[in-house]
Design a protein with these regions (language model features):
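Active-site catalytic loop in hydrolytic enzyme cores
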Residues: 87-170, 189-190
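Short, compositionally biased "basic patch" segments
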Residues: 1-22, 29, 124-144, 220, ...
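Cysteine/selenocysteine-centered motifs that mediate thiol-based redox chemistry or coordinate metal-sulfur cofactors
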Residues: 143-157, 254-292
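Cys-nucleophile CN-hydrolase/nitrilase-fold catalytic domain and related Cys-dependent amidase chemistry
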Residues: 22-115, 181-183, 190-192, 196
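CN hydrolase (nitrilase-like) catalytic-core segments centered on the catalytic cysteine
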Residues: 62-75, 159-266
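Short, surface-exposed connector motifs at secondary-structure boundaries
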Residues: 42-48, 145-149, 170-175
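Active-site-proximal beta-strand elements of phosphoester/diester hydrolases
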Residues: 1-22, 114-116, 149-158, 176-178
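Short catalytic-loop micro-motif centered on adjacent basic/acidic residues
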Residues: 48-52, 151-154, 175-177, 203
Length: 292
């Protein structure tokens, strides 16, 4: 599967403007989004991942139509959504949109699902409350299946919970993390450990200001990053291919054989108590029978 990660800038001023009911909907901002999406389409990527808080909610229908037309999936952070309420403080949500295209009876469609951020970062919650708003917390995580690709989505600070980030071991072929985070060293350690502990691909996308956007595989230090990027003034994408079937085939082998075969030079062995039955069910397309 060909994955593209966006390398683009997030602005703190855009967050402030949302809270002031003066959102930035400039042509320049739209053109940057358009350039990224068009680049992904030209490169025929299967999935494009954008950072946390990136996409204005009002532009989602346009993006959904583009996904349907080109059969390209997109995972993107949605700019903070402020909902004004009568006689109550406005409610502010941090959403991640998962847009999955499909074809039904020769017609092209796309499905949008929203993940509500479960754990808001302390400074994020503080800023929301400083504008006399209330932060909305989610209460669940989702496991997605699209074209036999099983993945879950986490939004930045959620990854700091050991319990939350470990719940999809063996089930998820990949963990996708959308971020707006300057503590890249801390999150780098989390992602590298997560990739090995869950034995899956990790796709992390952060603002280009802080960087460390990457695709990481459960491998040794020298080869763990398929791509990694920071900085740059222009909005662009970087892409690489993840071998989902190859990783599953490796996971199904015993620990001793994993270390001996040639793929053992590419992947680290699976951790103790890894659920091989789940991988087998994915290979036989029967995992739907056991997930809730």
């Amino acid at each position: 599967m060909k994955i593209a990660v966006a390398n683009t800038l997030l602005l703190e001023s855009d967050f402030d403007r949302v809270l002031k009911d003066l959102p930035n909907r400039s042509r320049l901002r739209y053109d940057r989004l358009q350039d990224i999406v068009n680049s992904a389409i030209e490169q025929k990527v299967d999935m494009l991942v954008l950072p946390e808080c990136y996409l204005p909610f009002e532009w989602l229908p346009i993006l959904a139509r583009t996904c349907a037309k080109n059969q390209m999936a997109i995972v993107t952070g949605v700019e903070h959504l402020k909902v004004n309420r009568k006689k109550r403080a406005p409610l502010v949500s941090n959403l991640t949109a998962v847009i999955l295209p499909f074809i039904e009876e020769n017609y092209k469609f796309s499905y949008i699902h929203f993940h509500t951020k479960v754990h808001l970062a302390p400074h994020e919650k503080e800023k929301i409350e400083s504008f006399r708003c209330v932060a909305n917390n989610g209460n669940r995580y989702e496991l997605y299946n699209w074209n036999d690709f099983w993945f879950s989505v986490y939004c930045c600070f959620e990854l700091t919970s050991i319990y939350d980030r470990s719940m999809f071991q063996a089930y998820a072929d990949a963990i996708i993390a959308v971020e707006w985070n300057k503590d890249t060293n801390y999150y780098s350690n989390i992602v590298e450990s997560l990739s090995r502990d869950l034995h899956c691909f990790c796709i992390q996308v952060n603002t280009s200001e802080f960087g460390d956007s990457r695709i990481t595989i459960p491998s040794k230090t020298e080869t763990k990053d398929l791509l990694k990027v920071k900085g740059g003034k222009n909005a662009t994408i970087l892409l690489d291919t993840i071998d989902i079937v190859g990783l599953r085939n490796f996971q199904l082998k015993g620990h001793t054989l994993q270390e001996k075969i040639s793929e053992g030079k590419k992947y680290k062995p699976t951790p103790p108590d890894f659920n091989y039955d789940v991988v087998s069910k994915k290979m036989h397309k029967s995992l739907w029978d056991v997930v809730e």
